[in-house]
Amino acid sequence: MVTRIGLESYEVMACHGAYDFEREKKQPFVISIWATLISDVDEDNLEMTLNYADLQTAVDDEIINSEPVKLMETLCKKLIDRISQNPLVESISIRMEKPDAPFPHPGGLAVVEQEWTRD
């Protein structure tokens, strides 16, 4: 059996983007994170798993309460670096959406996905 812990469609407001105006005014980001554990959760013990609240706290710290960056790729990497510190995590999948990304004309959804696996 494989155990995956997730946080889906967590919407936050933050100031990140390639253009100066994006780093000055908050805009929505929608983050989904899935982490696969190294082994099954055999005990009814929160210490033997990944607390999904920790995923939300990681987003808050790395996306909302951090210095502005230009790329969603950088934000995904920051989340992976943080979550992968948990030795129980074998792999991580992150999807980040930017609903109000500045496209040349209406339509589309800006999305970045990153995956990480422990060596």
Outline where the language-model segments fall.
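N-terminal, polar/charged subdomain of small-to-medium soluble alpha/beta proteins
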Residues: 1-119
